[in-house]
Amino acid sequence: MIDPSSSEEEGEDDAVPNVSSKGRLTNTTKGTSAVSIIGGSAGSVVGSNIPVSGSNTDLIGNQRQSNISSICNRNDVGNISVAALGSTSNKIEQICGNRADTGNLEVPSNGIPSGISQETLNQSVGSSRANSLPRPLSPSPSLTSEKHETAEPHGKHEREEEERKRRIQLYVFISRCISYPFNAKQPTDMTKRQTKISKQQLEIITQRFQAFLKGETQIMADEAFQNAVQSYHDVFLKSERVLKMVQSGASSQHDFREVFRNNIEKRVRSLPEIDGLSKETVLTSWMAKFDIILKGTGEEDSKRPSRMQQSLNSELILSKEQLYDMFQQILLVKKFEHQILFNALMLDSADEQAAAIRRELDGRMQRVGEMEKNRKLMPKFVLKEMESLYVEELKSSINLLMANLESLPVSKGNMDSKYGLQKLKRYNHSTPSFLKLILRSHGSLSKLEGDSEDGSTQLTKLDVVLTFQLEVIVMEVENGEKLQTDQAEASKPMWDTQGDFTTTHPLPVVKVKLYTENPGMLALEDKELGKVTLKPTPLSSKSPEWHRMIVPKNLPDQDIRIKIACRLDKPLNMKHCGYLYAIGKSVWKKWKRRYFVLVQVSQYTFAMCSYKEKKSEPSEMMQLDGYTVDYIEAASANLMFGIDLNGGRYFFNAVREGDSISFACDDENECSLWVMAMYRATGQSHKPTPPITQDKNSAMSKIQGDADKARKHGMEDFISTDPCTFDHATLFKTLQNLTLEYRLNDPYASLGWFSPGQVFVLDEYCARYGVRGCYRHLCYLSDLLDRAEKQHMIDPTLIHYSFAFCASHVHGNRPDGVGSITHEEKEKFSEIKERLRQLLEFQITNFRYCFPFGRPEGALKATLSLLERVLMKDIVTPVPPEEVRQMIKKSLETAALVNYTRLSNKAKIDEDLRGDVIVPAPKKLEDLIHLAELCVDLLQQNEEHYGEAFAWFSDLLVEHAEIFWSLFAVDMDRVLSEQAPDTWDSFPLFQILNDYLRTDDNLRNGRFHQHLRDTFAPLVVRYVDLMESSIAQSIHKGFEKERWESKGINAALNPAALNNAAQALNTAALNPSMILCGKKDQVNFYVPKLPKQSNSTAANDEMRNGCATSEDLFWKLDALQSFIRDLHWPDAEFRQHLEQRLKMMAVDMIEQCIQRTDSSFQSWLKKNIAFISTDYILPSEMCAMVNVILDAKNQSFKLTTIDGIDLYKFHAKIDDQIDKANVAMTQGLSGKLMSVLESTLSKLARYDEGSLIGSILSFTNVSSSGKDLGQGYVNFFRNNMDQVRGKIADDLWTLHFFEQWYSQQINMLCNWLSERVDHALHYAQVASISHIIKKIYSDFELQGVLEDKLNSKAYQAVAQRMATEEATCALTMPDACEDEPCDEIREGEEEDNGDESTSNIPRGLPKPKVAAAQAAAVTNVVAGRVGNLLGKGIGGLSSKLGSGSWF
């Protein structure tokens, strides 16, 4: 990612300390003290080799403030005190760099093409440039034309060697950017990238999910989660598109997780609410289980190699070592090559790197000057006026780099000085004319303002005051114990085990005195035992050394030695120090040895100062502006000043126009260090080379050794080359391309975004070496498009950023402050724009395969947004919406063909229709149905995963679907045309398509939906016609052969069978081919196979629901209506027509069924009319007929109404016919049964008074008691009650029938008794009717007849009459009645034993108590009867007597 904030002036903390995070200039003083305390052995004396200056003044004698601290130590001799005296200055003048008035350094972004931001994309747009000029060769602002191009090597080895050299040279520039950055920083606000999934990891993940589905894991899951995982595995993980997404490097575990989460969210949301369990809890639980399956045990992470682990850290903020390592891998630089370059370039030296930057910037400024004079060196611009603008922009960019460099702090106190970069009028521009061919002056910001010497500001002595940290540690006294401090008495410096001083003296004098404590109470001072004077410098030894103390002459012990460690730290702004011989024309006019310090006031200001002991200000100083340093011979120095310079062996000088200074020292290494330090300070391009005459055995510096090592390995040219001579734009193009290749191959799904470390280095390179921002982004776009065209997944948002930057620049909007536009940039942009347009068109056309399952998230939406941006003519005028729509419409039309072609190939429909092998028609239809399912899935996925992205173009997505279906319609019509006539295997195809289309608001009643209706409407009509004919034939033939066996109740009562029947009906409705045969004029239903019945089910097999023909009829009618209803015919008018026709058909068929059943019932009623006895039982056939009528009544409501509403009044009509048939059958059955009672009563009538037959029967005692006749009738109605209850399914009808039958029987008995109200009944009549009355009441009560129906007035009258008759019999015929108790007992036994025959049971003797009770009851009845007779009068009595006698 190109970070918008990468141009801020911030450096690495370890390279440049104390840099404010917001670019604020801070004043720091470096002087921390770190001391090593070493206990030395007694007697060892180490001498000091520190050169001593001429001043030996005692520290106490200094007029500046001094503090004396006393440290009390104990040893065997007595109490000894050691005092150290440190010099401090009252006031330290701090040297500060330039500070902005507000305290914050605001750095403009002009000229630093380090990135783009959101503000860049939203900037106001200037007018576009219409003119154009010829295309230049390069946009790089380099002076050299780079026209020399080496001929292409002919051998592979030579080409590889050239490429290796190019990469090493590039690595040299990169390593300098890493070691000392001053423009960019590593961004911390970039989006964290997820680790991508490789092909091998995809296989492992798939295996984990397969193991879960097989139950091989320990993860507990319910069936719903199992189904969700199964769907995820089949649809997503096994998809070819997911494999391609993995191969493109765009998929991460986050993507896999999000796809599953989106799927289960829809599933869980559709589930019903469960009390106590929220759907959020279910989602969380499912996602936790999914994560366990997806990530496995985690053992793979522990086995990851270290190199891969290092790559995984690339998303973090990287250290310099990690950045070096990363770009070694990018540029294929070996480790030892890096080490050689690191040492030779002195990458660990901030001074050397800052000096190199100053030389580079000076060189670039000179090239700008040459370009200004020679316009042919410039690239060609679209407008001639841009040449001057280009020069100003180059100067501005260089000045900005200088400002960035100047903003880096050197040490405390230099940022607020009036000698900051902005106020320096001249710096190193005064070059002697004889050196101009060799040396290069160093440019500065003020050079553009003028070269007036008068306006230059000179340094004062206060500006170069240094601050030193001084540490003094007293270790031990010889021949005594090691000293320990146990109290401190002085305030400053505070002594503990050491004394810390702050001083501004480069040459301080430290005096340490040893005292013995005076034990006297009134003693004023301690006795001095000895003292030692130290003169430390920053170059002095830091280790403890023994010193001989100066002892007063009056002490007996004249040899006291003390071990002291004295350390003087070197401030950061002191670059070098030491003793030199010097002579100059304006300063140091006398040749003598002085103590010199090279002071850095700011990044561009250095001073050479000489100091005396105990002085904080320099005695003399020289500002190094414009000087050039180099080695010289002693003879040259003598000749230059005309005197014999005695002292010093190794000479060097600093020269500028009108001035020259010579220096000398006694050590060769010291001479080299001074020259290198001054070389960095002057900023000269010429690097001094030591004279060859120097002693080879002398200890040369490490720098020279590193240079020799680099020369040995052939890297000297890479190190010493001038960066200004390179075309950095071309080098950067290579660097960016290699970095992108490395990034796309790292473990992260970067989508082309660079890591923070890569962004930082690229930003720093562009800023430091002047790579134009537009060129950078154009190269980036070209590289990204190359990868995208090779099926790498590149984030369209990233392309959008770079494209918007380039478009803004080309149209003159200055996103980075650069207004000049080269001809090459404009042409390159046009080329990129066309390539990008073609790529976007391809991606939108193949959106399902470029963005599988809508991943990466938001990519398609960003692609459409980018397309709109690309189609804009300029940055101001928005593109017409119709143009964007036309482009997307064209792409989606092509996408429909692409998607359908791939699906049809997958379903092999092309092979079926256009292949060489002849495929049977059913196989073609099967493949077509499979293709339809795939098409529905595809369009549902489009809506689910891509609908949101196409929200602004939803109508185009609908049109895409219509075109897609139109392609399918061509194959569908061809396959259907090849099917045999009157086959119904194609109805599942209609249901699949129609069920999808009718639920889609956009496609419902669309073009394809209308075509589907038109195609299948004739098939539906033909199917209904054939079904109607088939049902009519089945009724006609079925009733002719009907055996009237009950069917269906068992299936209705058995839940297992009911479930199976429901499944069979659903199957039949969904696939009519299973229920219809292929005959042209006859259609037979497929009868589902019922499950095997259990014993208990088989025992109730007689309980049925109708006959075979009626069951078949009702099942067919219901299946046909269900099938047509489940078609969900989209056309409301045709759907209503079908409904009306099917309801009318049902009415007609049921009516025929009723008529045929009623006709058969009437014929059965006429059978056995001649002989009706108590042995008669209703035939099961008649019961079956009743069941048919009852079932017809139940079925008619469902078959003739629409959702329970009698819309067409069909139900009322058929229900009336059913009721009539039902009434007729009920009457027929009851009449048949009542004829038996009538026959029984006619037999009992033979015993009437005055009947000859009755008298004979009574006299002969043939009739016994008459009970057998009554018992026979009881057996009759019991048997028929069981028959009706067992054979007729409707319990309500049965109850109603029993109530009616009971009422008819009671009424008939009542009428029969009423006819004999004036006559006494024969005891046989009494016995029979009394038995019937008792049993009929109890038995019908058991069948569910209610009390109010049973205990009717007729029954009460009969019961009362029979009680009277029984009493009369008991009085008049006691012998006959004596057997009654026995009969009652026997009847009870018969009830218990279930025995219906009583004729062979012997009579028993009466019980005395029962007889007595019976006699009392009879007496009462007779008394009442006699009273009744008397009350009727004489006429009544005479009529009784006259009509016959009981005897």
UniProtKB/Swiss-Prot annotation:
InterPro entries registered for this protein in UniProt: C2_dom, CAPS, MUN_dom, Munc13_1, PH-like_dom_sf, PH_domain
Start and end residues of each stretch annotated as Disordered: 1-35, 101-163, 1386-1406
GO CC term, one of those recorded: cytoplasmic vesicle membrane
Main localisation: membrane
UniProt domain MHD1: residue ranges: 970-1157
Domain of life of the source: Eukaryota
Coiled coil (UniProt feature): none
Domain PH residue range list: 573-683
Chain ranges of the C2 domain: 417-547
UniProtKB keywords: Calcium, Cytoplasmic vesicle, Exocytosis, Lipid-binding, Membrane, Metal-binding, Protein transport, Synapse, Transport
Cell compartments where the protein resides: Cytoplasmic vesicle membrane; Synapse
Annotated Polar residues bias: 18-32, 111-126
Comp. bias intervals (Basic and acidic residues): 145-163
Biased composition (Acidic residues): 1-15, 1386-1395
Disruption phenotype: Flies display locomotory deficits and complete embryonic lethality. The mutant NMJ reveals a 50% loss in evoked glutamatergic transmission, and an accumulation of synaptic vesicles at active zones. They also display a 3-fold accumulation of DCVs in synaptic terminals.
UniProt remark on domains: The PH domain is essential for regulated exocytosis and binds phospholipids.
Role noted for this protein: Calcium-binding protein involved in exocytosis of vesicles filled with neurotransmitters and neuropeptides. May specifically mediate the Ca(2+)-dependent exocytosis of large dense-core vesicles (DCVs) and other dense-core vesicles. However, it probably also participates in small clear synaptic vesicles (SVs) exocytosis and it is unclear whether its function is related to Ca(2+) triggering.
Name recorded for this polypeptide: Calcium-dependent secretion activator
Underlying gene: Cadps
